[in-house]
C-alpha cells in the first residue's frame, strides 16, 4: 500500500504502553512507509473519545486503546464494531482475567499508573545520578553506583546509562583510553557491579566515522583508524581482565537488548 498505515493510540493516561507495543509489532513488517502513529492521550470523556474515533474512521485507521475506564473502553469498542474499524483493546482482556483470578475489581483509575510515589522519585534520582557521573566526571560516584559501565569510546555507555536510569538503576560509566589511567575507585567496588562493553573493530570504525562526519571532521582521523581501534580494544580487554568483570558485545544489539542483558547479569548476583 502506498499510504502509511495510520494507527490511533487512545488512552486515558499517557499512552506510551500502546506506543511501545505498536512499534514492536510494526518493526516486524517490511512497510513501504513507517506507520503513522497518532497518540491521543488523557482522553477522559466520551466527547473527546468520539472526536478521536471519528478521525480514525475518516482516515481508515486502526485503533489501539489503553482506556482504563471500562465505560470508555466499551464505548470505543462499540463504535469500532459499528464502523468496521480494526480495534485492539490492550488492557481489558487482561484486566478481566486478573479480576476473575483474584476476585477483586479493577480500580479503573487511569492516573494510578503514574502516581508520584517513591518509585517515581527513585527514578528521578537515578536519572540525575547518571547525568552527574556520566563519562567518569567524578570517580567518587563509582562507589555508589548500582552498575558501572566500562568501555572504549562509542560503545553505547551513555545511552545505556540513561536507559537503565529510567529503570531506577544508578549507573556510572568510565571511558577507557590507553593514555589515561583508570580510576582507582574501579578496584574498590565488587566486580559483579561492573560491566565491560566492547564491539568488533569493523563496527567501531563504522560508528566512529559516522560520528566524525556528524561533527564535520575528517573520517581519516586516527580516532577511526584500524591501528588506533585495535589498540583501544586490546586495552579494553586487558582492563576487563584486571577488573574481573563480565563483558558484553554491543555490536548489532539495540540499547534495549543490551540493557536487558546487563540487568540479567546484575540481578543474577542478588
Curated annotation (Swiss-Prot):
Entry similarity comment: Belongs to the pyruvate, phosphate/water dikinase regulatory protein family. PDRP subfamily.
Organism name: Listeria monocytogenes serovar 1/2a (strain ATCC BAA-679 / EGD-e)
GO molecular function: ADP binding; ATP binding; phosphotransferase activity, phosphate group as acceptor; protein serine/threonine kinase activity
Record protein name field: Putative pyruvate, phosphate dikinase regulatory protein 2
Pfam families on file: Kinase-PPPase
Coiled coil: none
Function comment: Bifunctional serine/threonine kinase and phosphorylase involved in the regulation of the pyruvate, phosphate dikinase (PPDK) by catalyzing its phosphorylation/dephosphorylation.
Residues that hold ADP according to the record: 151-158
EC number: 2.7.11.32, 2.7.4.27
Keyword terms, alphabetized: Kinase, Nucleotide-binding, Serine/threonine-protein kinase, Transferase
Origin: domain of life: Bacteria
Amino acid at each position: 500500500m502506498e499510504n502509511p498505515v495510520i494507527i490511533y493510540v487512545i488512552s486515558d493516561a499517557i499512552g506510551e504502553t500502546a506506543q511501545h507495543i505498536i512499534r514492536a509489532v510494526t518493526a516486524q513488517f517490511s512497510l513501504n512507509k513507517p506507520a503513522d502513529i497518532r497518540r491521543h492521550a488523557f482522553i477522559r470523556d466520551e466527547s473527546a473519545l468520539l472526536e478521536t474515533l471519528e478521525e480514525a474512521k475518516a482516515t481508515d485507521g486502526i485503533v489501539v486503546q489503553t482506556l482504563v475506564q471500562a465505560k470508555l473502553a466499551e464505548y470505543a469498542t462499540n463504535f469500532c464494531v459499528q464502523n468496521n474499524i480494526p480495534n485492539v483493546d490492550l488492557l481489558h482482556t487482561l484486566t478481566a482475567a486478573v479480576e476473575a483470578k483474584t476476585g477483586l475489581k479493577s480500580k479503573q483509575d487511569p492516573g494510578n499508573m503514574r502516581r508520584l510515589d517513591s518509585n517515581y522519585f527513585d527514578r528521578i534520582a537515578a536519572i540525575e545520578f547518571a547525568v552527574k557521573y556520566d563519562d567518569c566526571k567524578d570517580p567518587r560516584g563509582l562507589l555508589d553506583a548500582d552498575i558501572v559501565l566500562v568501555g572504549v569510546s562509542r560503545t553505547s555507555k551513555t545511552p545505556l546509562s540513561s536507559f537503565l536510569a529510567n529503570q531506577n538503576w544508578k549507573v556510572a560509566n568510565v571511558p577507557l583510553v590507553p593514555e589515561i589511567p583508570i580510576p582507582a575507585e574501579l578496584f574498590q567496588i565488587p566486580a559483579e557491579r561492573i560491566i565491560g562493553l566492547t564491539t568488533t573493530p569493523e563496527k567501531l570504525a563504522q560508528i566512529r566515522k559516522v560520528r566524525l562526519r556528524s561533527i564535520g571532521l575528517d573520517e581519516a582521523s586516527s580516532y577511526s583508524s584500524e591501528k588506533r581501534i585495535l589498540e583501544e580494544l586490546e586495552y579494553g580487554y586487558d582492563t576487563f581482565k584486571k577488573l574481573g568483570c563480565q563483558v558484553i558485545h554491543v555490536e548489532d544489539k539495540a540499547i534495549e537488548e543490551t540493557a536487558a542483558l546487563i540487568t540479567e547479569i546484575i540481578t543474577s548476583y542478588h
